[in-house]
């Protein structure tokens, strides 16, 4: 009887762990240090081409101002998409999910995400954290 209870408990715990892992497919794609002067040369290159359906942006250290973002797909014609992003993110703030329009069956993978922007209200460089969801 004890072994039946142990097996049942083990299966229940395994199911809980399995479902928790599947429920959260959010992955930290990278962190970019934002300079104090406006620049459009900020790029996050993904070492492994990854299917990403949407992203979130977070200001981990300092406030930042963004003037643009684009996502580049691994494709024969170097397809890209401009993203609609908020112009300002305060320290500790995270944006809503920003959808990335991939192809119809969502099989196109992201190779690079570029940003234009800079740190505001700080002498230190702000950090922009990029979180992806597949």
From Swiss-Prot:
Metal-binding recorded as keyword: no
Keyword presence, rRNA processing: no
Alphabetically ordered keywords of this record: Signal
Signal peptide (residue range): 1-23
Similarity-based family: Belongs to the UPF0412 family.
The protein's name: UPF0412 protein YaaI
The species this protein was found in: Escherichia coli O157:H7
Taxonomic classification: Bacteria, Pseudomonadati, Pseudomonadota, Gammaproteobacteria, Enterobacterales
Gene: yaaI
């Amino acid at each position: 009887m004890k072994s039946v209870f142990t097996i049942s408990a083990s299966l229940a715990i395994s199911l809980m762990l399995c479902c928790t892992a599947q429920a959260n497919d959010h992955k930290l794609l990278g962190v970019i240090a934002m300079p104090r002067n406006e620049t459009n040369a900020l790029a996050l290159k993904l070492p492994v081409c990854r299917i990403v359906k949407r992203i979130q942006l977070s200001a981990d250290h300092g406030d930042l101002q963004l003037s643009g973002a684009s996502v580049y797909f691994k494709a024969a014609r170097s397809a890209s998409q401009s993203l609609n992003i908020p112009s300002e993110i305060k320290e500790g703030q995270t944006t809503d999910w920003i959808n990335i329009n991939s192809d119809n069956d969502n099989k196109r993978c992201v190779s690079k995400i570029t940003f234009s922007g800079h740190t505001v209200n700080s002498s230190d460089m702000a950090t922009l954290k990029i979180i992806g969801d597949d």
